[in-house]
């Protein structure tokens, strides 16, 4: 293990002894400076996203929302010590309630296979633990560019970690095989595909390049699709697992219809814990017109006033 990976690992273990409110205090101290640094990448991206999602919001309200989102970004970083820095079963004790478990139980009992769409919302690593504690699950993932981190991820997730399936041809075939046997797979639904490999569909009112893999798998296998996330409770009280049925049309043969339903499912999750979404992500960077500047580029160059939805 590389020295910097080992250092990160032992920092997580050391911070893991702290209660969640203390970790969030540290997270707030990390998130607030992102707001103070006007040209920080995280602030710029979050500000652009708020302009897209809330185009009619006045500047003061938008600034307050950006600040809140950046503080939650800090919380997302430090809460990893409570998840990866502890025994997995101890971390699961942070789950205080579950909403929508009846959908999950019914999907397992149906034997049709289950696709869990888990957006980058709240604490998705704790959601992985919760799912893995109830049923074997394989998650589709792209390995980190620096392979040294991959060993730490496997170690951190421990004995409750899901099976990790690479996002390549062999990995996708493994997902089909698992679903055909009535198994469970997890997919991050809002990862932006490469140009030409996705479908532009509305996301919070503006077309975004959307993955077609999940709708295609759902259409071809007949598996149930559910959305799920682990919401942070106020004042570090723990987490609430929320499970929602997928919108109608997510397995439609028409990809635009299916991807619109996929994005609507993500929206329904985000609307329940808005500031806990990963708003630092450049979700709308790729535009349908390749000659159109993406809004993040305009913002970085002081030209966000030219942006028109």
For each of these PLM feature ranges, what is it?
Residues 110-169, 192-202:
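Catalytic core of membrane glycerolipid acyltransferases/transacylases, capturing the structured
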Residues 12, 47-48, 128-129, 154, ...:
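Short glycine-/small-residue-rich flexible loop motifs, especially phosphate/cofactor-binding loops
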Residues 49, 165, 244:
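General small-molecule cofactor/ligand-binding pocket signal
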Residues 3, 38, 95-96, 119, ...:
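Residues that cap or flank secondary-structure elements
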Residues 42-45, 143-147, 207-211:
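Active-site metal-coordination segments of metallo-dependent hydrolases
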Residues 1-118, 152, 159-161, 305-309:
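Membrane-anchoring hydrophobic helices of lipid-metabolizing enzymes
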Residues 31, 38, 63-70, 105-109, ...:
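Non-catalytic C-terminal accessory region of glycerolipid acyltransferases
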């Amino acid at each position: 293990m590389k020295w910097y990976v080992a250092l990160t690992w032992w920092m997580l273990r050391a911070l893991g002894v702290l209660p969640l409110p203390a970790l969030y205090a540290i997270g707030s101290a990390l998130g607030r400076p992102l707001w103070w640094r006007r040209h920080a990448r995280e602030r710029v991206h979050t500000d652009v996203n708020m302009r897209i999602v809330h185009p009619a919001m006045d500047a003061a309200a938008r600034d307050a929302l950006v600040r809140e989102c950046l503080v939650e970004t800090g919380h997302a970083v430090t809460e990893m010590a409570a998840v990866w820095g502890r025994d997995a079963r101890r971390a699961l004790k942070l789950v205080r309630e579950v909403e929508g478990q009846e959908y999950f139980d019914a999907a397992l009992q149906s034997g049709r296979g289950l696709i869990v769409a888990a957006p980058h919302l709240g604490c998705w690593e704790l959601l992985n633990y919760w799912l893995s504690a109830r049923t074997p699950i394989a998650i589709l993932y792209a390995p980190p560019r620096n392979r040294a981190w991959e060993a730490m991820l496997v170690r951190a997730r421990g004995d409750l970690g899901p099976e990790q399936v690479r996002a390549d041809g062999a990995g996708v075939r493994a997902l089909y095989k698992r679903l055909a046997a009535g198994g469970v797979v997890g997919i991050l639904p809002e990862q932006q595909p490469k140009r030409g490999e996705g479908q532009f569909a509305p996301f919070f009112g503006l077309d975004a390049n959307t993955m077609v893999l999940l709708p295609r798998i759902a259409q071809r296998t007949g598996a149930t699709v559910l959305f799920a996330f682990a919401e942070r409770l106020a004042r570090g009280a723990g987490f609430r697992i929320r499970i929602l049925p997928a919108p109608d049309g997510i397995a439609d043969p028409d990809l635009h219809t299916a991807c619109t339903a996929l994005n609507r499912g993500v929206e329904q999750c985000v609307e329940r814990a808005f500031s806990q979404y990963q708003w630092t992500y450049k979700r709308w960077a790729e535009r349908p017109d390749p000659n159109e500047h993406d809004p993040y580029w305009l913002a970085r160059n002081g030209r966000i006033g030219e942006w028109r939805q």
